[in-house]
Swiss-Prot record:
Residue numbers spanned by region G4 motif: 273-280
UniProt organism field: Rattus norvegicus
Gene Ontology biological process terms from the UniProt entry: action potential; adenylate cyclase-modulating G protein-coupled receptor signaling pathway; calcium-mediated signaling; phospholipase C-activating dopamine receptor signaling pathway; phospholipase C-activating G protein-coupled receptor signaling pathway
Keyword Lipoprotein listed: no
UniProt keyword annotations, A-Z: GTP-binding, Magnesium, Metal-binding, Nucleotide-binding, Transducer
InterPro entries, A to Z: Gprotein_alpha_Q (IPR000654), Gprotein_alpha_su (IPR001019), GproteinA_insert (IPR011025), P-loop_NTPase (IPR027417)
GO molecular function: G protein-coupled receptor binding; G-protein beta/gamma-subunit complex binding; GTP binding; GTPase activity; metal ion binding
List of residues binding GTP: 49-56, 183-189, 208-212, 277-280, 346
Amino acids binding Mg(2+): 56, 189
Record-given protein name: Guanine nucleotide-binding protein subunit alpha-15
Amino acid sequence: MARSLTWGCCPWCLTEEEKTAARIDQEINKILLEQKKQERGELKLLLLGPGESGKSTFIKQMRIIHGAGYSEEDRRAFRLLVYQNIFVSMQAMIEAMDRLQIPFSRPDSKQHASLVMTQDPYKVSSFEKPYAVAMQYLWRDAGIRACYERRREFHLLDSAVYYLSHLERIAEDDYIPTAQDVLRSRMPTTGINEYCFSVQKTKLRIVDAGGQKSERKKWIHCFENVIALIYLASLSEYDQCLEENSQENRMKESLALFSTILELPWFKSTSVILFLNKTDILEDKIHTSHLASYFPSFQGPRRDAEAAKRFILDMYARVYASCAEPHDGGRKGSRARRLFAHFTCATDTHSVRSVFKDVRDSVLARYLDEINLL
């Protein structure tokens, strides 16, 4: 009969083979214990929201605030993306001018526009002087400016006015993107992206899922072991339509997505952090685009950004409350989650640092206290 091994017995009672097996067993247990410690010490947050709500910008801010930031070499790598964003923006306005029947105001604008349209934005390798001169000329054209004011009628990157206002600097031969240039750069998120960093000795892993509808089916495997959900929504999209569907209002789609996510079983007891983003764009846009034109239930004054922000927050709060209500008339005791809402400007590092500190002090501290990690 083969004897059973008891590793607690005296070492000299074991054969060499048993000693080797015991050593391997101890090493495996040590590795498993270390993995458990790492898993216990790492907290995962899921970052969700519709496309262009600012999720990637938020991740970049976390890298600047809590990570290594962006070295000169890192920033240099964004140069072609900045050029691409500029060409995409100017070409979008040139095409929209024709569709909206807005004429150019300057004599040589058509010639400059034709030159800009010859470049494939996704094959840009440099920002050659003729293109830079053409864009600077066009950006001073009153027709282009009038088209920009009607940007809600076509798809235009939020960063367009920022980059076009800095063309002279960006067109320099030795151009290296600044941290702000990097934050403003836009590349659609596809698939799942993760970023890890530490806050007060706590390891955080933020999982960023693609915001476009075609990407949402890939989120499912990210839902497990999430301590909090961060949902980003744009305040400025109330008068815009989806890039994928020109008939669907972006804010209504975001509210519907928020509701869908809250109803998922994975989030029944997960705290929800709501970032209502792009306060700066809302404050600029509200002067020319009345919120009530798109959401008739808004009865606040025109051109009042604070009233608009409160109304939009209330819409999201009502969605949250409706998803938290029991469907059978009883209590949903299993739902111990809470909603933490913040207004943000993801391109403002100081603002994001302050907001994330509030998140850390509320949501993360609450969770760590519950599992006795504090």
